[in-house]
Each structure stands twice: as structure tokens, then as C-alpha cells.
A protein has these predicted regions:
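An N-terminal, well-structured beta->alpha segment
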Residues: 2-109, 200-231, 243
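N-terminal small/polar loop signature for handling phosphorylated ligands or for N-terminal nucleophile
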Residues: 87-156, 251-253, 258-315, 383, ...
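Catalytic-core signal marking the mid-to-C-terminal active-site face
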Residues: 466
Length: 466
């Protein structure tokens, strides 16, 4: 009874409040206990749960409470928090029954901070998740939040936190933030006032600036723009009803390629993900059915898929036998690692020191980058699984003047990097299928380094020179 009263008192959203009132009216005590007797756990990835009413669901109230805890902790950590500000981005998720959408949750997140005099960089439009950590670093903000559940089912949403270094938070930040949340669960004055987003002089829209500079940064890893403009290679892209379409189009343009052909049924945002059972591109051919069908119609040999918040990638390629090859993450890492090192070597001065070059992977990833590093002479490091660990290490290396060419899982360079990589692969006189180019090269390194985690084919095609 106490928890019911507390929730109804604190929740300012009529729809979620009504959900709890209906459960009380219908005597659904077990459901009430499940929803109200435990709170969301705040971890190093922030929050993630189903949308709906209750303390253990993602909703207006729990996001306000979490942001109040974030404010309290950041105020303790940064004496200049009110000067540096906070970044907020969001995807296109939403749930009608609880009046809960990523955009609304982002506005409430901003309102909590604006009411406390903190400048908020709130994107005026949905953005890919990588834009938020990029903006945190570029704008020198204290931290940032992305409202997204990435490739999860449509019922879910999340609250992903990034620290000042652009990486997801690590312990003990998560535990300290959770303590702060528990100390201030009652909404403050102004926390429900989402109109502050439109009226406060502390609200800033970073969309145009970040989009422009992000794409300019992408151009720095584009080594053959003139050749790219002349290619006839076609690409199909699906964004799985998420944020990716506009931004992948911009990324291809930055590299000089013709825009990829979008899958029309999946191009526009749709919080119901109505054409796929699971909006995760790593599920393989089962979720790429519309993409592969369009590719065959358009005579395109390469399909690129991004998940709903555009931070996860899948690539499929038509083989000589007429079948589609969907590359694994480890196979893509081998290709991207080879491509980035080859491009670095071809475009560096003679004085460039390979010992200043790094590639990183997590401990659960393939050892292929380690094999390439051993052969080519650059540094390879492993981190614990998770973008938070690899991101923090990349930041440390960059701050110490090192050059990080690639990290697996791949970061922002992956989606636009597909096009020049495949264009280069098809450039040789013998246009062997990328599967063979990949596995033959990987196979050579596996034999040399005692690795056996990728298949070695029985063919020996001509390889692009390293």
C-alpha cells in the first residue's frame, strides 16, 4: 500500500498513473508487487527495461528520478558542471499505452537539469547513438545520456550514460549514481516541466554542428575519394525502422559514393519495427529478407544493415554461387583491420612510426587483429568486453599521442567504411568474392600465428597487396 501511494503521488503521467490505478481496482496484487516493490538497477550501461508503469519500468518518473541522481552525482564530481553542461540524445522508440517515447524522455531528462541551471545540449531530432559520446567530447560536456534500447524488442527502452571522456561509465560511477538516485526519488520543482526545453536560454541544439563536424571527421579516414566517385558498385542499406537512414546517406556522401539504395519498407522510423521480429542485424538472413530481395532486384552485391540506433552493423555479400554471405563480427574486424592498416601505411610519411599505431579488441573477440599486429609490427591490446572499457582505453591512448586505427567491436568508422573497403576489394584484376579475400588472408595469419577460429578455404585467389 505504501509503494502504491508513493508511486501515485510521484507520477505525473496520467497514462502510467492510470495503469497502476486499474491494477489496484482489479485487485491484481502480484502485478502490483512486480511493478512497485523493486527499482530499476543502474549499471555501467545505465538503465534498460520495458516501458510502462512502475518503479522497475522505463517511464517518465523513473527517468526523472535517474536524472536527479545523475545531477546530484555530477555536481559532486565537477565543480564546473554548470559551465560544461550535459548532452541528451534519443532514438525513435515509443509506446502509446504509456505515452512514453524516447523524445519525451529526453525532454524530461533535459528539464530536470535545466531547472537546476545546467546547460543542456538537446538534439532537436533523433540521432545515432555515437553522436552523443562524440558530442560529449567535442563540446567538453561533463556527461551525456542517450535514450535508446538499441536493438532490443519494441517494448523496451533505455537510458545510456556517457562520461566526460565519451565512454560509457565504469564502476564505481554506476554504484555512486544509484546511491544518489535513491536519495532523491521525489521529483523536484521543475522536473516535470518539459516546456523548459523550449523556454530556457540554457537549451542548446547541437544537431547541425555535430552532424557537420562528425562527417568532416569521417572524411579523414577516406583515402580514395576520387576513385569512390567513379565506382559503379551498388549498396543496399536498411535502418530497421530506426535512426540510421539520413545519417548513413550523409556518411556515404562524405566518402564520395553514390547514396546507398534504401529498403523502402524499413527506411522511416517505426517504433513497432513492423517488418521484423527482432531489429537486430546480427540475426542474419532471417532479418535481412527485404534487403536481400531488393539487392537482387537492383543487381546490388552488398547489403549494409544498421540497428535502430545505428551503432551496430551487419554486412551481407552476394557470392559467386548465388548465395548470400552474412559476415560475422570477427570477419568484419579482420577486413576492417587489414583495410585501416593498409590505408595508414599507404598514406603515411616515411617517418611515421608503426610502433605508435594501435588496434584494440575485447577479450571475447577473435584474435585476428593480434595476428595482424604481430605480422605488421603495430601494437595490439585487449580490454574487457564492453564499449565502456574499449572507449576509455582509446581515450587514454589518444591523450598520450598514440594513433588508434581500429577497435573491435568497431566504432563510428564501420558503416561508411564498408563502401571503400568493398570498392577496393573489387578493384583488383581478379575480382574474387570478398569471402575468399577475407578468409584467405585470415587463413594465412591463422597458420602463421597458430589461430584456428576462422575457416580457411580451399581456394587461393589473388590478394590485394598489403
Amino acid at each position: 500500500i505504501t509503494m502504491i501511494g508513493e508511486y501515485l503521488k510521484e507520477d505525473g503521467n496520467p497514462k502510467t498513473k492510470e495503469q497502476i490505478e486499474n491494477l489496484v481496482r482489479n485487485g491484481m496484487n502480484k502485478e502490483l508487487r512486480d511493478r512497485l516493490c523493486c527499482r530499476l538497477t543502474f549499471g555501467t550501461a545505465g538503465l534498460r527495461s520495458a516501458m510502462g508503469a512502475g518503479f522497475c519500468y522505463i517511464n517518465d518518473l523513473t527517468v526523472i528520478q535517474s536524472t536527479q541522481g545523475m545531477y546530484k552525482y555530477l555536481e559532486r564530481c565537477f565543480s564546473d558542471f554548470r559551465q560544461r553542461g550535459f548532452v541528451v540524445g534519443y532514438d525513435t522508440r515509443g509506446q502509446v499505452t504509456s505515452s512514453c517515447s524516447s523524445k519525451r524522455l529526453a525532454k524530461l531528462t533535459a528539464a530536470v537539469l535545466l531547472a537546476k541551471g545546467v546547460p543542456v545540449y538537446l538534439f532537436s531530432k533523433y540521432v545515432p547513438t555515437p553522436f552523443v559520446p562524440y558530442a560529449v567530447r567535442h563540446l567538453k560536456a561533463a556527461a551525456g545520456v542517450m535514450i535508446t534500447a538499441s536493438h532490443n524488442r519494441k517494448e523496451d527502452n533505455g537510458y545510456k550514460v556517457y562520461w566526460e571522456n565519451g565512454a560509457q561509465i565504469t564502476s564505481p560511477h554506476d554504484k555512486e549514481i544509484l546511491k544518489c538516485i535513491e536519495e532523491c526519488v521525489e521529483p523536484w520543482n521543475g522536473s516535470w516541466n518539459e516546456n523548459l526545453v523550449d523556454t530556457s536560454p540554457l537549451t542548446r541544439d547541437p544537431l547541425e554542428e555535430i552532424s557537420k563536424i562528425y562527417m568532416e571527421d569521417l572524411k579523414k579516414i577516406c583515402y580514395h575519394r576520387e576513385l569512390n566517385t567513379k565506382t559503379n558498385l551498388k549498396f543496399i542499406h536498411t535502418s530497421f525502422h530506426g535512426v540510421g537512414h539520413d545519417y548513413v546517406q550523409l556518411a556515404f556522401k562524405a566518402f564520395g559514393f553514390k547514396p546507398p539504395i534504401p529498403v523502402p519498407e524499413q527506411k522511416d522510423p517505426d517504433p513497432d519495427f513492423s517488418t521484423v521480429k527482432c531489429p537486430n542485424p546480427e540475426e542474419g538472413e532471417s532479418v535481412l529478407e527485404l534487403s536481400l530481395r531488393l539487392a537482387e532486384k537492383e543487381s546490388a552485391r552488398v547489403v549494409v544493415a544498421t540497428d535502430p540506433d545505428a551503432d551496430r552493423l551487419a554486412v551481407a555479400e552476394l557470392q559467386e554461387n548465388g548465395r548470400w554471405k552474412v559476415f560475422t563480427g570477427n570477419e568484419l574486424a579482420a577486413l576492417f583491420g587489414w583495410w585501416m592498416f593498409r590505408s595508414w601505411k599507404a598514406n603515411s610519411s616515411k617517418e611515421a612510426d608503426v610502433k605508435n599505431v594501435y588496434m584494440l579488441a575485447t577479450t571475447v573477440s577473435s584474435k585476428i587483429l593480434k595476428a595482424i599486429a604481430r605480422k605488421e609490427g603495430f601494437h595490439f591490446e585487449e580490454t574487457l568486453p564492453g564499449f565502456k572499457w574499449i572507449g576509455s582505453r582509446v581515450k587514454d591512448l589518444l591523450d598520450n599521442g598514440k594513433e588508434v586505427l581500429f577497435q573491435h567491436p568497431a566504432g563510428r568508422q564501420a558503416p561508411p567504411g564498408v563502401a571503400p573497403l568493398w570498392h577496393r576489394i573489387y578493384t583488383p584484376a581478379d575480382p574474387s568474392a570478398p569471402q575468399f579475400l577475407l578468409t584467405a588472408r585470415v587463413g594465412r595469419w591463422n597458420v602463421e600465428c597458430g589461430l584456428a577460429d576462422l575457416h580457411i578455404p580451399s581456394v587461393s585467389p589473388v590478394l590485394p597487396s598489403s
